[in-house]
């Protein structure tokens, strides 16, 4: 989403500074988002999150192009994202060991899926 935001700004004639603002805005909006795919498949809830992130990218690009800057620079938001990612437990890092992947509905569906 951050790369898409930066690319959108660049394609629409924005400055490198505006690209950085768009990137930072997206990172601040999705900071801490976990990866909890049901049954370990990158489908639920990932597809909907990808759609939401696409909207985040376009919104961030529009904000940056409108002159709305990020108080925290892009490089620092990237560092913060890394720090948060390092702090997350393994269960929330695409392992299907936490979050939505461990709801009763998700576990029941995974059991049926892998029984095939």
Predicted features, each with a name:
Residues 1:
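Glycine-rich phosphate/ribose-binding loops and adjacent secondary-structure elements
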Residues 6-116:
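Functionally critical mobile loop/hinge segments
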